[in-house]
Structure formats: C-alpha cells, structure tokens
C-alpha cells in the first residue's frame, strides 16, 4: 500500500513539476511587470503626486497638457535625434563590422571580444568615463594641439552635448548588433555565396542579393533593440549631461524621471510613459510587418 501511494505521488510530481517552472515565472512577471504597468496606465489619468494615497481623476487632462509643454516637445525632438542615430548607426555599423569580423583576418577572436566589450559595461560607468574625456581629456588635447573647437568641453554647448550623447549611446549600443549580425552571416550556407562568386558576382552583389536578405530577421531584432534603446535612453544621458545645457539633452526617459521624482508629478510622468510605450509598440509592429515582406 505504501509503495503504491509512493508511486502515485511520483507520477503526480512528474506530471505537475514542469508546470511549476512555467507558473512561477509567469506569476513573478505578472506581479513585477504587468501589475505596475497597468497601475502606471491608470495613474496617467490622475493627478497623483506619489507621496500619498490620495489622488483625483483628471481624465485626459495630463495628455492635453503634454502637447502644450515645451519641455515635452523639446524631449521629443532630442529623443527622435538619438533614436534615428541609434537605429541607423547600429544597423549600418553593425553589419559593416560584422562583415569585417566574418572575413578571414588575423586576430579574429581578439577583435570579436574587443568589439563586444562595451556591452558588458554598465551605461552609468561608460557615461562617467566619457564625461571626464569630454570635460578634461579633449580640452587638454585641443589646447596642446591648438585645435580651437576642442579647447572647450563639448558638453557645454547644445549641439556638442547632443553629439556627445549620440556618440556614447552608439559606442556602447553597437556591440550587441555586431554579434547578432555576425551570427546571421555565419548562418548563411557557404554553398550559395561560393556559387555566386563562381558565377562572377562581385562582393557588392553578394551582399545586396544574398547576405542582406538573409540578415533581414537580424535587422528586425536590431531595429527593435535600437528603437527601444533610443526612446528609453536615460542612464547615460542622466550621468553625462543631466539633460543640459538648457534641457538640450533631456530625453523622454529623463523627463519622466524629472517630473516624477523631482516635481512629484507622478500622474503627469505616467502620461509621458504611456505615450512612450505606444510609440515603441506601433513603430515595432510597422517595422516587423514591412521586414517580413522582404525576408527569405
């Protein structure tokens, strides 16, 4: 009897044990992701300050105020600049460097590790390092070599700070796309490229007609990652420029932080976050549908 009950218990455990590994992560995701997400969406229709449990339902008033807020429009402009730069830069540079690393060059393993190195650093660390470079390193070089535009910190001017922010985000952001594109290139059957070269295809023709179509799924992944990275840029910008000078480098993510934690306008900040969420979703869906038409 005892043996039979033990066997029954063993069968029950075998049957439901796997479900535990599915249910527990889903439960944790619901608690720490979906619940806060829906709470944030709800609070975007209120004037909640984040300091008390008291709030008043204001409907769409937060969203109406957003489009009359010069800080929001300025943040939209800067975020658009860094997002476009990251999407174009990560795809173009990622494919170019991945093709170089995929070719037969000496020290291939070293260069792969070298280009991936920025991905393992925290954004805050990278930003603080480059802040010192832009504030002290480049001006010292500019003074030594009598290069006028380098004699003052890039972070002190509007377009200099924007350039610095884009450069740092792209320097760190391109590391992962290189690995993704490299994996995509190595998945292309060598028989196809060899046959094309035997038939007289140039390197440019091989890229446009064979490699690029095979890389489109990788392009879709990198596009979404770069889009998300650009639209939600925060830590590098916060640590390096703080949104300055004169709010020139205030991203949407930084604006959410400022309104929520500096001005105690959590309802208003959540309204910005909701718009940001829908921007990412809509653009990602459009991109995925367009790219599927060209995939092999």
Predicted region positions:
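A structural signal for multi-pass alpha-helical bundles of membrane permease subunits
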Residues: 10-296
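Short, Lys/Arg-rich, polar N-terminal cytosolic tail immediately upstream
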Residues: 1-13
